Amino acid sequence: MTDSLAIIEQIHKSFDLKDFNSLAIPAKAEFFCSIDSVSQLQQALVYAKQQNLKITPISGGSNLVLAADVSGLVLHINLKGVSASTVVDNTVDISVAAGENWHDFVTLCLNNGWHGLENLALIPGNMGAAPIQNIGAYGVELSHFLQSVDVVNVETVQPEVLTDEDCDFGYRTSVFKQSALDKYVITGVNLRLSTQPVTHVSYPALADLLQGVEPTPKIVFDTVCQLRRSKLPDPKEIPNVGSFFKNPIVSKQQADQLMATYPEIPMFPLKGDFTKLAAAWLIEHCGFKGSRHGKVGVHHKQALVLVNFEGNGEDILLLAENIKTQVAEKFAVVLEVEPRIYGHTY
């Protein structure tokens, strides 16, 4: 088993995590270590096993809520590197380390003529979090391009490769949030992109802005950035984790009942007997959009975004629970929280 002695001097005690979560919550890690290589990760996992410490991997911190101080060993996954294969049949395979910034990578792809990810521009966070929730926006999801995920098994401390089928992707979910929760630490992601200028512009908000325009990948990229900046606050300026709730999926029967009462409610038909609803609309029509609740609140331009004004994790979760309760009472729809909660059963 990998020697863990070298890692000890790199581990910090009672480490402030405020700068490592985009909600800027002032929680502390009992122990903390920044991970720059797979071998260092293996050493840290061995050390955690020897000391009987629970491990908590984080990266960009853009999809988590720290409800309290985090016990055990927090691993900041900071692996870097992007490599591309030779182009074959108008496609290119790209391997990306888990610590690479997502938007910077999308920009790199655009500049290199690797296409497909333009709709996912400006999504906050790092590469390692992308497959966990199968990030998506404006009609495109990561799973459309993912070939495999490089991981280290927490129990065996050995590297493994999970195929796209192994990842069991769904709407904002994957095996990493379900049966393999806490089983792996993601170290890299392998994608296949097109070297031909393909675009995806069927999403209504995108289609409206591009009406009468011949969309190029650059135009789609710029338009998506424009849309996101117009609706979503920059976490560096107003701490947030982006969309706090998933868009709920209901039966067609329930959707029809809602439509009869609320003819203006946005709906998106899905395969089978299901319909996706706009969580932001439900929250806004419960009166939460732009509201402030002590040191936290709901953004004035996007009701899906909860923002932090120097509050703590419990403040955020109390607001989220209030929103869930009001939406359930008014619409009989259950909202599901998108970010992962640490230090609290929710």
Question: Residue ranges of each PLM-predicted region?
Answer:
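Generic structural marker for isolated residues within well-ordered, non-membrane alpha-helices
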Residues: 106, 279, 324
